[in-house]
Amino acid sequence: MPGIKRILTVTILALCLPSPGNAQAQCTNGFDLDRQSGQCLDIDECRTIPEACRGDMMCVNQNGGYLCIPRTNPVYRGPYSNPYSTPYSGPYPAAAPPLSAPNYPTISRPLICRFGYQMDESNQCVDVDECATDSHQCNPTQICINTEGGYTCSCTDGYWLLEGQCLDIDECRYGYCQQLCANVPGSYSCTCNPGFTLNEDGRSCQDVNECATENPCVQTCVNTYGSFICRCDPGYELEEDGVHCSDMDECSFSEFLCQHECVNQPGTYFCSCPPGYILLDDNRSCQDINECEHRNHTCNLQQTCYNLQGGFKCIDPIRCEEPYLRISDNRCMCPAENPGCRDQPFTILYRDMDVVSGRSVPADIFQMQATTRYPGAYYIFQIKSGNEGREFYMRQTGPISATLVMTRPIKGPREIQLDLEMITVNTVINFRGSSVIRLRIYVSQYPF
């Protein structure tokens, strides 16, 4: 009949067995012993067990058991004959009547397949593929997996089942990635910080050696974990972009780097000296060249070469003016017998000296003293001429000596001529006379 399943009637034989050590017989599960007939009769569990089947399931009694099937399941009940069960031939209690083969009526029992199975054309129970027939209860977020006699609802990778729903698993919460993790529905993806590359396992990160792959630095590249550092050669400094190097102007760091002039060059610097000087081994200090000693001057034979700081001076022979007479290369004398010498210094001595520009003051630069000391005489020292700027003064240091003191720094180049006078006073013989040192001071251009 279309739409109705055929139910095959079956006969279940109940066995009546003696109880060990007891003459009383026992029946198999699902049957009960009828003491009057001595036969094992089926127990109707649908009547004796409360709520044997629950919900939309109905209870169908079977010989020796029962089935729970959907109430909407159509059942065809065909007649079948139930053979007699074989009686137990062993001893019985004396009160029991003699056993005889009872007559069972012909009953109709349905053959029903268990839930999840269906009858095929050969009246065999075969599994129902609920997934293929779309008769499952899995929701769209789940996957139906057929099993023997049923099915299961499962979730795809990256989801887990919670209260009948497939919820995305946040893999990033469990530290699947070594560095950066991005959760996506049903999966996740790992990425790395700048300076790293993702390994083949898709999870761990490996440092990128930027110096070996691209060498972004202009000069020296030093690889670090996850990055790199650019370094510059000596004499260069790293620019703000961290990649390029610019020349370092060492000369701008300090004015004392070189004694004279600092010359900057790409990556370095050097010190230079003005003409008349040479650079010392420390590569910063300048030393005067003695042109007179090395005969590297332009003085003629009549002139005297006088070395100065950074140069030289060709000094002409002295000329003694009337009434003075030249008595040596640097001395003029006024004869006492000459009436014109009465109020003039007895001698004029020519001396030369040099000082550096900007010399610190006060500074003792020249000493003057009497060569002969007469009884009853005393001496007075003074600057007779040339000190209009009040840059010097005479300090008497003893009865017959005095020192010329420079009181103000003098910037060169400059030439100064001072007449230093020593006055001799002798009260015993009522004598007063004087001598002069004509001092020529050459101030150099540089302070060294």
UniProtKB/Swiss-Prot annotation:
Changing G412E: In ARMD3; decreases secretion; slightly increases homodimerization in absence of Ca(2+). A motif (Cell attachment site) lies at residues 54-56. Residues 1-23 form the signal peptide. It holds the Pfam family Fibulin_C. One of its GO terms (cellular component) is extracellular space. PROSITE patterns: ASX_HYDROXYL, EGF_2, EGF_3, EGF_CA. It is found in: Secreted; Secreted, Extracellular space, Extracellular matrix. One of its GO terms (biological process) is intramembranous bone growth. Glycans are attached at N283, N296. Disulfide bonds join C46-C59, C53-C68, C131-C144, C138-C153, C155-C166, C172-C181, C177-C190, C192-C205, C211-C221, C217-C230, C232-C245, C251-C262, C258-C271, C273-C286, C292-C305, C299-C314, C320-C332. Changing I169T: In ARMD3; decreases secretion; slightly increases homodimerization in absence of Ca(2+); no effect on protein folding. CDD domains: EGF_CA (cd00054). Residues 245-448 are annotated as: Interaction with LOXL1. Keywords: Age-related macular degeneration, Calcium, Cell adhesion, Charcot-Marie-Tooth disease, Disease variant, Disulfide bond, EGF-like domain, Extracellular matrix, Glycoprotein, Neurodegeneration, Neuropathy, Repeat, Secreted, Signal. Belongs to the fibulin family. Essential for elastic fiber formation, is involved in the assembly of continuous elastin (ELN) polymer and promotes the interaction of microfibrils and ELN. Stabilizes and organizes elastic fibers in the skin, lung and vasculature. Promotes adhesion of endothelial cells through interaction of integrins and the RGD motif. Vascular ligand for integrin receptors which may play a role in vascular development and remodeling. May act as an adapter that mediates the interaction between FBN1 and ELN. It is linked to Charcot-Marie-Tooth disease, demyelinating, type 1H: An autosomal dominant demyelinating form of Charcot-Marie-Tooth disease, a disorder of the peripheral nervous system, characterized by progressive weakness and atrophy, initially of the peroneal muscles and later of the distal muscles of the arms. Charcot-Marie-Tooth disease is classified in two main groups on the basis of electrophysiologic properties and histopathology: primary peripheral demyelinating neuropathies (designated CMT1 when they are dominantly inherited) and primary peripheral axonal neuropathies (CMT2). This is Fibulin-5.
